[in-house]
Amino acid sequence: ASHVLEEMSYDNAVDILNELSKPKVASLLTLMNKDKANEIKALLHYEEDTAGGIMTTEFISLKSTTPVKEALIHVKEQAPDAETIYVIFAVNEDEQLVGVLSLRDLIVAENDAYIEDVMSERVISANVGDDQEDIAQLMRDYDFIAVPVVDYQNHLLGIITIDDILDVMDEEASEDYSRLAGVSDIDSTSDSMFKTASKRLPWLIVLTFLGMITATILGSFEDTLSQVALLAAFIPIISGMSGNSGTQSLAVSVRNISTGEINEQSKFKIALREAGSGLLSGIVCAVILFLIIVVIFRQPLLALIVGGSLTCAMTVGTLVGSMIPLVMNKCKIDPAVASGPFITTINDIVSML
């Protein structure tokens, strides 16, 4: 196993070692080449979900004062071991990041020029402690194939490449989908039934208590329902449509937050749009339900009550579904926690009212 790890890139080796117990990691490192083991040890000190945890130290950097002719030779020598050669970073004598250039820039430059003549000084970098999700957003916004990682003194420590970010995006998406389903952690096929249940129980217990509120509200209308028994038949439709519309707006809201499309100025506009969308959808569905009740049951008054209730429930449900993630994000809580079951239960309470 140690020989396999030696042949892997440092960041991939770290990913594997992070899944093992500390004694196992220590034993594997002692069997590896000393220099490679030291590089991996340094990377293992960083938190898994930070820039330091996913960066690699196998990259090409050049002194800004290096002549282009010498730089080409250096790149050719370092290329076999580098994670990528398409982006090259320039540093000063103190190993601080000062510029960036592409392999194309280097190839087309005059041989008597220097790196500082062809590099761009406008470098966007990540701090070693930045969250991996923020790095993914950064690379998505700027279409980077690699981003440099620096410390607080701007010393170049490593780079994060696009293949690592794709893994991060997949991991974050799986985590968000899991939370949207009301599961505290991602289920694994190897988990026991007890472990699986323990992941799902917290939200289910919360939803049980919220469901009791719904039952209490419904019980308070016992006299009304006894007089118009047919009204009870349409309660599932109203609560279901409220939950459906809320879940739709929730998914859109969480996605907009994760992609950075929502800012302070756009929140009111979004709330207005979602309320309007819920109202229009509610009116259309209410008209359809109104006609069905009139044709089948021949009770226009009941049709009017049910239609009006459906319109109000869908309007409020859509608004609640879009605003709860925004409020949670404002409170520095992961908006994906506002799961589908949670929103549905809240909207059940609203529809009962």
Predicted stretch roles:
Residues 346-353:
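Hydrophobic alpha-helical transmembrane segments in multi-pass integral membrane proteins
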Residues 169-319, 323-337, 341, 345-346:
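Alpha-helical transmembrane segments and their membrane-interface boundaries
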Residues 46, 59, 87-89, 107, ...:
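Broad hydrophobic/π-residue packing in well-ordered secondary structure
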Residues 1-180:
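Hydrophobic packing positions in regular secondary-structure scaffolds
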